Swiss-Prot record:
This is Probable transcriptional regulatory protein LCA_1307. GO terms for molecular function: DNA binding. Pfam families: TACO1_YebC_N, Transcrip_reg. The keyword Transcription applies. It comes from Latilactobacillus sakei subsp. sakei (strain 23K) (Lactobacillus sakei subsp. sakei). Belongs to the TACO1 family.
Amino acid sequence: MSGHSKWHNIQGRKNAQDAKRGKIFQKLSRELFMAARSGGPDPSSNAALRLIMDKARSANMPKDNIKRAIDKADGSDGANYDEITYEGYAPGGVAVLVHALTDNKNRTSSDVRVAFTRNGGTMGAAGSVAYMFDRRGYIAIAREGLDVDEDQMFEDILEAGADDLQTEEDVFEIYTDPKELANVRDILEKKYTLANAELTMIPQNTTPVDPEKVEQFQRLVDALEDNDDVQDVYTAGELPEEE
């Protein structure tokens, strides 16, 4: 698969995310709530919930927090969220998708627009950049200590039902049809330790970020991710390699 490594993007922001752990738990709680409300509270029959529970555990979210978020889905506390996707461009014309879960659309729309305009970006209309991304299942397997070559891994992921493999120096990145992610994950984790498994949006093509605009680009992404209502930020930006 063409494009930059998603895993390196994940790792590149890990330290910053560690410093925002409370905010991450809040966002995961909303995802758990929505998955449980739409598909039921039993992870054995709700693949989407099972994936988000794994994501929450990977983030070291306490079990009580996970249970509490799922229990709220019975509607007893009146909570509800709308899913909204915002589209726009970062500095240099880099496509950006923003996925939010909000209880106040007007507030979130205003906040996202401000984040774009204050950091050199522009908010786009619905459909302006979404077509540049594909929804995919994504699995990462770290290569450290793993005695498996690319050919063997490719054979294993095809047998599991995945359809693409990107091999990096430190990680195998596996891509699946979104509907097959949970099943592929269940099969692969019988043989491998998975570093990550999630639904994501992958850019069909990447856009190099102008070295002079890297700082502004990262400020925009940070401003969007810092918003309590924003769950995920996807970009087509390819950052220059550090010297």
